[in-house]
A protein has these predicted regions:
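NTP-handling and nucleic-acid-processing catalytic cores
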Residues: 1-101, 172-206, 210, 227, ...
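Residue patterns forming the tRNA-binding/recognition surfaces of aminoacyl-tRNA synthetases
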Residues: 1-7, 24, 68-224, 263, ...
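Alpha-helical recognition segments enriched in aromatics with Gly/Pro capping
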Residues: 17, 62, 90-102, 209-211, ...
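Secondary-structure transition/capping motifs at alpha-helix termini
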Residues: 38, 50, 88-95, 126-136, ...
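Catalytic adenosine-cofactor/nucleotide-binding cores of aminoacyl-tRNA synthetases and other
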Residues: 146-150, 339-343, 347-429, 520-523, ...
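Short amphipathic alpha-helical coiled-coil/interface segments
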Residues: 197, 397, 440, 444, ...
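Acidic, turn-prone loop/beta-hairpin segments
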Residues: 219, 238-239, 341, 374, ...
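C-terminal low-complexity, glycine/proline- and small-hydrophobic-enriched intrinsically disordered tails
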Residues: 518-705
């Protein structure tokens, strides 16, 4: 609503827009922007406040936005935090017109005294209209704070509170980060930290709640009436750790040795919850006593937390640690993204959208919860999470159990000892054996490097890929029919034990249990005390022939295996059928290496024969090109050539139709002139894909002719 405020100059008035008409009796000024030339002439003048007859000044302050409303705002220092600051700058009177329970008091005027604030709003607007002060009412979208428990509108009001002076505490905490003694990871968060700390305000630490740490301030009793209690701030007080110490200080302060505990009354307010939280790095270790834990664990190395509490918690722990312990509480502050709900909203009590970790643990397991969160939480951005996301961790736990069971079965069937690490004989190793060891070496190096850089998500993904893909998908399958089972089992035990240790920070329960069941650990031992894997020594790598060349060769061989399996699927060859294949290598030396892999390839291909040739001549069968050459699948006796020829012809016709459709668009001048460049480039890229597909389809058409 807009309120016309009659001025003192004849019948002049100024127009004020407000969303809080009920606070009008508490107004002590109206304000304009200093650069707003429309109102330069009235700055410093007085106006009469409607319905009260009280004169209030017109002031200028940068807080006022010229373009907002009428460009003039009413200032109520006792009932708005921004108005309070304006009032401080201009030394305005603070008139509190409400009681603690949201009713108007006597300062609001006799007519409104006792009314509920919302009832008063309606009454004031009606009276303004009746007196001719109301110009008009219009709808306005406003951000109104509500209590998350009772959903009542929160009312800002003036009250006496306890504050901590923060600037002297902030200065050494700023210096600790600027000097490099403490660093943020990623570093960009240090700018946010500096911005808050360099513009820090005194901290209001008192809260009017029933629960919490009670403020250790004690008043010397005087008038015990309600009116006397309301004047607590005028009574002498002391601050002390205990009531007994408070009594000693009260006696010293007043000079009255006859004071007793009955003469002291502790302040009823409690401390802001962050006031106890900022002591966390040392209060949990026995402080203020000088304990062994405090001496050993303070300061710690790393703090890992989310960006939304850098100021509320991180900065305050820095200040408290330096003030009380004379050194920062941690060396590295690792900031990760916020874990949000499935809709991207921050989890909060008011929204009721927080996930219950106990429910997740009950349904998926504690390890699944830990690993899944590590896998989706990054340093770079926020992440969305719902219950289904924890299936990843649960499925991974199952994979670990199944792999462990396979090892137990193999040990029992072949008489292998899981408890003792068998020596690895370099002369007995195949290329797949060496590849597994190199993959383990690379995984250990990668995980150590990523954890050293606090890339916890990337390290989790690296361990996941190493265990699931390299160990389970490939090497376990190889080990089932390995030509040298003893060598394969020795390697499998070695890499499995390393994988469990790499996984332990993420999944401590399943890795600990499996390590004991497999005999890697004795009774009373724990992975926590085991060495974190670093890879292999130079001597071991030399003795076992572990090179990047071996690794790359087996990776290319696996690419060929995947291609052959894709061909089988494409032509719907029965998984049980044995096929005939040909590998055409790029060079003769590659062909020689591949001949040594024939038995392994026959098992992987499920082939009755694998012919190795070299050269460039195209063979009359479907094939897929890879790094080592082209793998071909003979379809003789496996597919209905007539049916396949018909299928290929239909697909060829459909693909050619798609190309014609794209050509029609690209030849349309209107489309080219108005379509976004990205759309046009996308159409061209799609056309190139279809052209390549046609080449393959034409080859197949010849094959089935």
């Amino acid at each position: 609503s807009a309120l016309g405020v009659k001025g003192v100059l004849n019948t002049d008035y100024i127009m004020v827009a407000t969303t809080r008409p009920e606070t009008l009796p508490g107004d002590t000024a109206v304000a304009v922007n200093p650069s707003d030339e429309r109102f330069t002439a009235i700055v410093g003048k007085n106006v009469i406040l409607p319905l009260t007859g009280r004169e209030i000044p017109v002031i200028s302050d940068m807080y006022v936005e010229k373009e907002f409303g009428t460009g003039i705002v009413k200032i109520t220092p006792a009932h708005d935090p921004n108005d309070f600051l304006v009032g401080k700058r201009h030394n305005l009177e603070q008139i509190n017109i409400m009681t603690d329970d949201g009713h108007m008091n006597e300062l609001a005027g006799a007519k409104y005294c006792g009314m509920d604030r919302f009832e008063c709003r309606k009454a004031l607007v009606a009276d303004l209209e009746a007196e001719g002060y109301l110009d008009h009412i219009e709808d306005y979208d406003n951000q109104v704070g509500h209590c998350y428990r009772c959903h009542e509108v929160v009312e800002s009001r003036l009250s006496k509170q306890w504050f901590v002076r923060m600037k002297p505490l902030a200065e050494p905490a700023i210096a600790a980060v600027k000097s490099g003694e403490v660093r943020f990871v990623p570093d960009r968060w240090s700018k946010i930290y500096f911005n808050w700390m360099e513009n820090i305000q005194d901290w209001c630490i008192s809260r009017q709640l029933w629960w919490g740490h009670r403020i250790p301030a004690y008043y010397v009793r005087g008038d015990s009436s309600e009116e006397g209690k309301a004047k607590n701030e005028e009574r002498p007080f002391v601050v002390a750790e205990t009531p007994e110490k408070a009594l000693e200080r009260a006696k010293a302060m007043t000079g009255n040795d006859k004071l007793t505990m009955a003469d002291l009354e502790q302040d009823e307010d409690v401390l802001d919850t962050w006031f106890s939280s900022w002591l966390w790095p040392f209060s949990t270790l026995g402080w203020p006593e000088k304990t062994a834990d405090l001496d050993y664990y303070y300061p710690t190395t790393d703090l890992v937390t989310a960006q939304d509490i850098i100021f509320f918690w991180v900065a305050r722990m820095m200040m408290a640690g330096i003030h009380f312990m004379k050194k920062p509480p941690f060396a590295n502050i690792v900031i990760h993204g916020i874990v949000r709900d499935a809709q991207g909203r921050k989890m909060s009590k008011s929204l009721g959208n927080s996930l219950d970790p106990l429910k997740i643990i009950d349904e998926y397991s504690a390890d699944a919860l830990r690993f899944s969160l590590a896998l989706i939480t990054s340093l770079d951005c926020d992440s969305k999470v719902d219950m289904k996301k924890f299936e990843v961790g649960r499925n991974f736990s199952t994979k670990i159990w199944n792999a462990a069971r396979f090892m137990q079965m193999q040990a029992e069937a072949n008489g292998f000892d899981l408890a003792a690490a068998a020596p690895i004989d370099g002369a007995a190793l195949s290329s797949d054996d060496r590849h597994m060891l190199v993959a383990c070496e690379k995984a250990c190096e990668k995980v150590n490097d990523l954890l050293g850089k606090y890339r916890i998500q990337d390290a989790a993904l690296a361990v996941y890929d190493f265990f699931w893909t390299q160990i389970c998908d490939w090497y376990v399958e190889y080990a089932k029919d390995a030509p040298n089972k003893a060598a394969a089992f020795a390697i499998l035990r070695d890499v499995f034990w390393k994988a469990l240790r790499l996984l332990h920070p993420y999944m401590p329960f399943v890795t600990e249990e499996v390590a004991h069941q497999l005999g890697f650990l004795k009774e009373g031992e724990t992975i926590l005390r085991a060495e974190f894997p670093k890879g292999y020594t130079a001597e071991e790598k030399a003795a076992w022939g572990l090179t990047d060349e071996v690794y790359d060769f087996v990776e290319a061989k696996r690419e060929m295996i995947t291609s052959l399996r894709a061909l089988r699927a494409e032509y719907k060859v029965s998984p049980a059928a044995f096929v005939k294949t040909t590998i055409q290598c790029h060079a003769a030396e590659v062909a020689e290496k591949m001949k040594a892999e024939v038995e392994t390839l026959k098992k992987a291909f499920r082939a009755e024969s694998v012919d190795i040739v070299s050269g460039e001549a195209e063979l009359a069968m479907p094939g897929i090109l890879g790094k080592l050459g082209t793998v071909y699948l003979s379809l003789e006796g496996l597919v209905d050539k007539a049916a396949e020829a018909k299928r290929v012809a239909t697909e060829l016709q459909k693909t050619q139709g798609f190309i014609k459709s794209i050509d029609a668009k690209l030849s349309n001048e209107n489309f080219v002139a108005h379509a976004p460049a990205a759309i046009i480039e996308g159409q061209k890229a799609k056309r190139a894909e279809l052209e390549a597909k046609i080449v393959q389809l034409e080859k197949l058409a010849k094959l089935f002719a």
